[in-house]
């Protein structure tokens, strides 16, 4: 939830989930 896309340097899997 704290991640929105890989640009934030979050976990790729989590980033993808929140980005989509």
UniProtKB/Swiss-Prot annotation:
Its EC number is 3.1.1.4. One of its GO terms (cellular component) is extracellular region. Contains 7 disulfide bonds. Keywords: Disulfide bond, Hydrolase, Neurotoxin, Presynaptic neurotoxin, Secreted, Toxin. GO terms for molecular function: phospholipase A2 activity; toxin activity. Binds 1 Ca(2+) ion. It is found in: Secreted. It catalyses: a 1,2-diacyl-sn-glycero-3-phosphocholine + H2O = a 1-acyl-sn-glycero-3-phosphocholine + a fatty acid + H(+). Expressed by the venom gland. Belongs to the phospholipase A2 family. Group II subfamily. D49 sub-subfamily. This is Acidic phospholipase A2 CbIbeta. It comes from Pseudocerastes fieldi (Field's horned viper). The lineage of its organism: Eukaryota, Metazoa, Chordata, Craniata, Vertebrata.
